Structures are given as structure tokens and as C-alpha cells.
Amino acid sequence: MTAKSAAAAARATVYGYPRQGPNRELKKAIEGYWKGRVSAPELRSLAADLRAANWRRLADAGIDEVPAGDFSYYDHVLDTTVMVGAIPERHRAAVAADALDGYFAMARGTQEVAPLEMTKWFDTNYHYLVPELGPDTVFTADSTKQVTELAEAVALGLTARPVLVGPVTYLLLAKPAPGAPADFEPLTLLDRLLPVYAEVLTDLRAAGAEWVQLDEPAFVQDRTPAELNALERAYRELGALTDRPKLLVASYFDRLGDALPVLAKAPIEGLALDFTDAAATNLDALAAVGGLPGKRLVAGVVNGRNIWINDLQKSLSTLGTLLGLADRVDVSASCSLLHVPLDTGAERDIEPQILRWLAFARQKTAEIVTLAKGLAQGTDAITGELAASRADMASRAGSPITRNPAVRARAEAVTDDDARRSQPYAERTAAQRAHLGLPPLPTTTIGSFPQTGEIRAARADLRDGRIDIAGYEERIRAEIQEVISFQEKTGLDVLVHGEPERNDMVQYFAEQLTGYLATQHGWVQSYGTRYVRPPILAGDISRPEPMTVRWTTYAQSLTEKPVKGMLTGPVTMLAWSFVRDDQPLGDTARQVALALRDEVNDLEAAGTSVIQVDEPALRETLPLRAADHTAYLAWATEAFRLTTSGVRPDTQIHTHMCYAEFGDIVQAIDDLDADVISLEAARSHMQVAHELATHGYPREAGPGVYDIHSPRVPSAEEAAALLRTGLKAIPAERLWVNPDCGLKTRGWPETRASLENLVATARTLRGELSAS
């Protein structure tokens, strides 16, 4: 096919779409099901209606081929686990008794059975449930979900492409099952897994699928020759199947690297590549391997992870270059649109001009359709859209929101000494222990306490004008009193105020910092039914006034025990926001760090002796390619130290991280120079404690002993077992006792029981230590 004919054949498609519905209907229905207020048939009916509405919306917008199977009640990787029959032994009875309840038990756990581990989906803010595989794992195909959802789309008269997690990525995302040898590699199960995928592909072909998309994003990370060989073998074998659909292998989030020539030569019919941000180098790499002669290329030129409008002219230029490299070039987003909110049209509080800088899922869909039209019919067919794109981009570049001279001057004046504590840790820790007087194995929580219905109602009442600010603050003070009282009665050593005034750990600060924008309906899925509204970091950042001081000092007035000041760190403020793309991330991080530094200093001046600066996103924002790590970690750790280095030696700086693998950033954790770090560890059985010990981490640490992502209450015996494991890696004088993460999403009953068990565990082990 010539470049001209390839252009004429251009189609518009997407890899996936937000699942929740315009008003988060799916979240509400699932939580209603868990509480017994919604029946299983009602939940399934609502889910089918949401899928149909999404498909119709995409088709009406001009999408030629809609995705099927991207919908999920909880997580698409968990759906894949069900599809291949890799149900953990402890969950098989529940799944056999009731497939839906068993599915949710794998995701959330029960009082009797622990859930699957949860971790970040590559470097995004989405979480997946980690498959557990062992030498004895037997795979069996169950394509019910995939075939059913394809049939629903076909019944609407649509061209649909089923979307699956690819077999090699699935195995690379997995971990050894409990009881498996520690050195077991799930990838060794590829020969068992491929026949199951072959059966699913056959089922989908029989159900009418012309194309099936197999996602292999694991190969945008550095991979070994053995892993690349597994990729080659997988698609050589799947490609050799006779009765199968056409195969479109998709990658996203970064450049494909050494996997690109493997897939370019594979006996598949199509390849989907990301051409945004760091992945823009895929264009030159594709040319270097000779392109994709005789194959379909789906070009991800619209950024599926950020919310800024597309530079249509630049994207058309990229598409024009790609025309000579494949038999057919289609247009898409860089990844699933799962990672962005649904529609800017729902926003009423953002200035109309600024709103024109933004593109959520519906607007990105329109951009994709526009680009496909421009590619197929020429730029004359989209002159109006191109003119609007140029005007909106110029408006953003010239806005005073994006450039504040005072902020820029302060950031440029930062010196190395500004990001360095006045004394080394060995000297600081003695001053802190003398000042705080804490027992061995001190107990604390990570920050937030349950956000009850009463708290949410108070926030809604204030927003809707049913109460004034004085009435709202009275309710917040009452909640803080209750939280402090509970912690004192329970016997916790370092307290928190519970954060009842905070809607979200990033949004709360973003709403008080100049340069951020807030949305009303910009919800994106974090995990399961947990949705967040990432703020939009649109311009230069400054702090007009203190943000947390009065609530922290109020809480401290209620107790003699230390109350932690609680802040969200600069890297997490970026990672959990939609961040401006018109300057380097390190420059933006420095601006945020300086604003937070002022808050840290104000907290100390108000008498706060323990200040926690959370950086749960430090690891998840790590670039996917090792070649990019050093530059990222340099600015990320500097931003943290810039935030925290203005305090006295006897002020104890804490930080917190969660949701991630920490082994490859232990040096960076050390470079933060925090006095105490708390980490998620309960589901991974204290693995992080051993990683810290192997590195020789010299400071205090609190690997979590209570998994807060499950409603299950861990017994004191379970917590004690985890703590004893932690003590094998971290000396008692440097070990803290705490949950994995904040308690915002938990209910009070399990919170009370779990924290009482946590304190009892610490006291038991203190006794054992003193006896020894």
C-alpha cells in the first residue's frame, strides 16, 4: 500500500475508556452490592448499560473500531487472572460458590482470607491486583466475560476489537505464589499459558472478532534477552494459529526499545505504539527497523495520560512521517483513556478560556477523530480545528497563570545548602530522642482516619450553603477531638489529627496553592471503587498563606503527646496531579517544594516537633527505563530535601511511601535524609524491611503491619509475626510500628480493632525485648 492509500485508509480507535459512568454509577452500584443494597442482577444490568453507553458515545463521536473487554468491575489484570483460571488456592472455594463474590474476595479479601497484593500499573496512578503463580499453577481458559462483552458490542451494530492483557506481560506482572520457591519465575509458565490464550482467541474469533488487541506494556521497561525471547516465541506460536483473529499487539507509556524489532518481525497483523513524551523516539526506532510492511500501525499521538489539548499540527506531522512505514496507519491515544477524566463539559467552575486548554476522554476522542479525518482527507478537511488548536495553545503559552516572575526568581536562587539539613542524622537523632522521649517500637498511624458519612455530609453542607464556615469548623474540631481521644485511650505514641478537613491528600493542598486548578467532576480510577480527582497543575506555584498550621496546633492543644504535622510531598503533588507539560518536571517540583518548605517552617514555629512529608509516589514516578532514573531521582530527592531542610535538628522529619516495589530506589530513599520512613509492607510480608537492611539503611523505619486496603482486621498474632520479621532486618531502636497507609477509606469498627491490636503487639514485643 502506498503512503497515499495508507492515509486514505486511516481509521480512529481507542484502547480503552473510563469505566465509571458520568456520575460514578459503577462505583455506587458496586459499593451498594457489597452492602447488600444492590443485587447481582442489578449490578450486571447497570454494568451492561454503562458499556453500551460508552460504545455508543465512541461510535457517535466517529470512532471506527471500539474496544471490548476493557470494562472491569475492579481491575483488568484480575479479569485476566479469571480468564486464564489462575485462581489462588485460598480463593477457589469462594469463586466456585459464587463467581462474583469470589472475584471481589480476591480483590478485597475477607475476614478469613487475604486478598491479592495490589501495586501500581507501571508508572501510572492506577493499581492492579498482582497474579500469584507457582510451579503447580494449572491454567484453564474461561472467555465468558470477553465473549459476552464482544457480543454486546456487535449486537449494537458496532465494529469491536477485544482487548486482552498479553500473555508475556501477564506473567511478568505476576509474583511467586505463597509456598512457591523464592526464586521461581512466573515466566517459566509460558508454555502452559499460551494454549489458554490460543483457546480464548479461538472463542473470540468464533464470536465475530476480526481483530484482538493484546497489550504488552511490560516491554517498555528494560528486559533481559530471555524475556525478549519469550515475547518472540509467544507471538510466533500465537501467530501460527490457523483459526484466529488478526492480532494487534499494543505497547504504551514509553519507548519499546529492543522489543520493537521482535514485534516488527513477528507473524502478527498489527502493532500499536505510543508516540508521545519519551515514547516519541519510537518513530525513529520504527524507521530504523524498516517499518511494518504489510502490517497495520495504530499510532498513539494523543496523550492518554495527561489532560492538555493536543498540538494537532504536530501530531499530523508525526502521522505523515509514519505513513511510509506501515501498510495502514490508524490514529489513537497513547494508551487507554482510563487514566483521564470523562468530560470537560461537566466542569462549571473553570474559566472558559482555561477550559479550552484541557482535553478529557471525550475531548481526546474528538481529537483522535479529527486527526484521522485530517490524515485520510487532508488538512483542508480540518482547517477550523487546526485554527482553534493554534489559538488555544497560544493562549496558554501567553497566560500570566503559567509564568510568575517572583516564583521563578526564588526557584533560580536555590543553593545546595538550601537542600541540606544543618546536622547529619547521627547527631539529629540524639536530639530528637531527648526531645520526644518515645518508648522502643513507637506506635503511630500514617495520618488520615476514617472519613465518616458525617464528615462528608459536613463538607457537602458547606459546599451547598446549608451551613456556614463557622458551623463546618465546629464539626471538624469535634472530629479532631474524637480522633485524639481515641488515640490516647488506645495508647498510640505519636498522634495525628486525622485529617477530617481534607478531601484528598493532594487536592487539599492544591486548592490552597496558587497555580493549581480544581475540577468538580474530574474523577479517575485509582483502584476498584476508589476514584480520585487529580488537581491540575497549570502554572507557577506559590503559597498565599499557611495551609495546615491551625488544625495541627488545635490538635496539639488537646494532648501532651506529640501530634504530627502532615503534608504531601512535592513529588507526590506532581505525580497525583495532571501536570503542566510546558517545562521540565524538575523545575515544577522545585516550585512546589519551596511552597511546602514555607509550610514546614511555619509548623515548626508553631510548636510541631514531628512533621511528616508523604512521598508515596516517589517510586511510582520512576521512569520505566533505567537510563532515565538518575536524572529523575536527582530532582525528586532534591525537591524533598528542599521541603524539609529548613528545620532544627531536634525536629523529626517523617516520610511515607506505599503501593510500590522499593528495592530499586533504596539509595534514593536514603538520599531523602528523612529521620523516619514508613512503608507499605503487610501484603508483601515485610520484603521492604529486608531491602532496607540489605542496603544498610541507617535511619528509623516503620514497615506496615496492617493492610489498610482490606476491611479485614489483622489479629495481634499476625501483626506480631510481621513485626518479628521486621526485627530480623531492622534493629529495635530504629523500628516503628504503624499501618501500611492512611485510614481514610476504612470504617471506624475495623480501624479501632486493628489499631488496638497494633498497640497490643508493640507492647508485647517491648516486653519480649526487655526480657531478653
Swiss-Prot record:
The organism's place on the tree of life at top rank: Bacteria
Binding residue positions for Zn(2+): H656, C658, E680, C741
Cystine crosslinks: none
GO molecular function: 5-methyltetrahydropteroyltriglutamate-homocysteine S-methyltransferase activity; zinc ion binding
GO terms (BP aspect): methionine biosynthetic process; methylation
Keywords: Amino-acid biosynthesis, Metal-binding, Methionine biosynthesis, Methyltransferase, Repeat, Transferase, Zinc
Catalytic activities: 5-methyltetrahydropteroyltri-L-glutamate + L-homocysteine = tetrahydropteroyltri-L-glutamate + L-methionine
Pathway(s) this gene product operates in, as recorded in its UniProt entry: Amino-acid biosynthesis; L-methionine biosynthesis via de novo pathway; L-methionine from L-homocysteine (MetE route): step 1/1
UniProt xrefs under CDD domains: CIMS_C_terminal_like, CIMS_N_terminal_like
Keyword Zinc listed: yes
InterPro entries listed in its UniProt record: Cbl-indep_Met_Synth_N, Cobalamin-indep_Met_synthase, Met_Synth_C/arc, UROD/MetE-like_sf
SUPFAM superfamilies: UROD/MetE-like
Binding site for L-methionine: I446, G447, S448, E499, D614
Pfam families: Meth_synt_1, Meth_synt_2
Residue positions binding 5-methyltetrahydropteroyltri-L-glutamate: R24, E25, L26, K27, K120, W576, E620
Cofactor: Zn(2+)
Active site, renumbered: H709
Similarity field: Belongs to the vitamin-B12 independent methionine synthase family.
Classification via NCBIfam families: met_syn_B12ind, PRK05222.1
Protein purpose: Catalyzes the transfer of a methyl group from 5-methyltetrahydrofolate to homocysteine resulting in methionine formation.
PANTHER family: 5-METHYLTETRAHYDROPTEROYLTRIGLUTAMATE--HOMOCYSTEINE METHYLTRANSFERASE (PTHR30519)
HAMAP family cross-referenced by the UniProt entry: Meth_synth
Protein name: 5-methyltetrahydropteroyltriglutamate--homocysteine methyltransferase
